[in-house]
A protein has these predicted regions:
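Rossmann-fold cofactor-recognition segment
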Residues: 51-69
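C-terminal helical subdomain
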Residues: 121, 184, 203-239, 244-248
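Canonical Rossmann dinucleotide-binding motif of NAD(H)/NADP(H)-dependent dehydrogenases/reductases
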Residues: 2-37
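A short hydrophobic alpha-helix cap/turn motif
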Residues: 29, 83, 134-135, 173-178, ...
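A glycine/serine/threonine-rich, flexible loop-to-helix segment
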Residues: 49, 177, 189-213, 253-255
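The beta1-alpha1 cofactor-binding region of Rossmann-like NAD(H)/NADP(H)-dependent oxidoreductases
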Residues: 45, 63-74, 222
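Conserved Rossmann-fold SDR core element
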Residues: 34, 165-168, 172-194, 221, ...
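Catalytic loop of short-chain dehydrogenase/reductase
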Residues: 13-23, 93-132, 136-177, 189-192, ...
Length: 255
């Protein structure tokens, strides 16, 4: 018996089997959940291929979070096929090249707008898809990178993560009376496809392991997946609006 027996989860942005979302989907299935994946654009074919590597191959739905039509179609599919949803994982993030790198001032508003819409506002989009299908409550979990500090080269993605954190708190406040919990998991740096596209990502890795009290393995997504699965379970019923650090303790220490 698993801690997610009978639960139905929407998992976004599984690109490869190195994705954090893949690790969450796999562990969720192992703990008894039924999952459906979403992908978008050129990444949709990657999601479909990667879905075959899960213990049970799930359905893959197209969801560009900037498209209200696709969001409505996903909601309609979930309602028709499942009738209810118990949880959703937000693992979505994107920034144009100008929003990353050494020059924070290089990005114009059009680039920043895309970054904020895809990486932060999309949490509200996912909540709008699943909340009506959670009559008995549920759990929305987002993947985050701690935005309290300014990181090398992270630039406007860091700003978007700060917006994501604020959005999660307001969603927690608004959806709490309906029994829906909203939390984020602030992960340490993990070598995913998305992470490798960030200029200066190696600087995060190099600093993390030696400073984290519990150490940190950037090749191991399991601690992050376990935290997400715990938040999807019924074991944390009073936890919402939380930013759960899964980073080996790096966030808690100084120099």
């Amino acid at each position: 018996m698993g801690i997610l027996d009978g639960k139905r989860l929407l998992i976004t942005c599984v690109l490869t089997d190195a994705s954090l979302a893949f690790a969450v989907a796999r562990l969720a299935q192992e703990e008894g959940a039924e999952v459906v994946l979403t992908g978008a654009g050129r990444g949709l074919s990657l999601t479909r291929r990667t879905a075959r590597k899960l213990p049970t191959e799930p359905e893959v739905l197209e969801l560009d979070v900037t498209s209200s039509e696709q969001a409505e179609a996903v909601q309609a599919w979930l309602e028709e096929r499942w009738g209810r949803v118990d949880g959703a994982l937000h693992a979505i993030g994107f920034a144009p090249e100008a929003c990353l790198g050494e020059d924070f001032m290089a990005a114009d508003w059009d680039d920043v707008r895309v970054t904020l819409e895809v990486s932060a506002y999309s949490l509200k989009t996912i909540a709008a898809v699943v909340a009506p299908l959670m009559p008995d409550g549920g759990s929305i979990v987002g993947l985050d990178f701690d935005a309290r500090l300014a990181w090398p080269a992270y630039n406007w993605m860091g700003v978007a993560k700060a917006a994501l954190e604020s959005t999660s708190r307001y969603l927690a406040r608004g959806l709490g009376p309906k029994g829906i919990r909203v939390n984020l998991v602030a992960a340490g740096p993990v070598r995913t496809m998305a992470a490798k596209s960030i200029p200066g990502f190696a600087a995060f890795e190099d600093a993390w392991g030696p400073r984290a009290p519990r150490g940190w393995d950037g090749d191991d997504p399991e601690p992050v997946a376990k935290a997400c699965v715990a938040l999807f379970s019924d074991w944390l019923p009073a936890t919402t609006g939380e930013l759960l650090h899964v980073d080996g303790g790096y966030h808690a220490v100084g120099a």
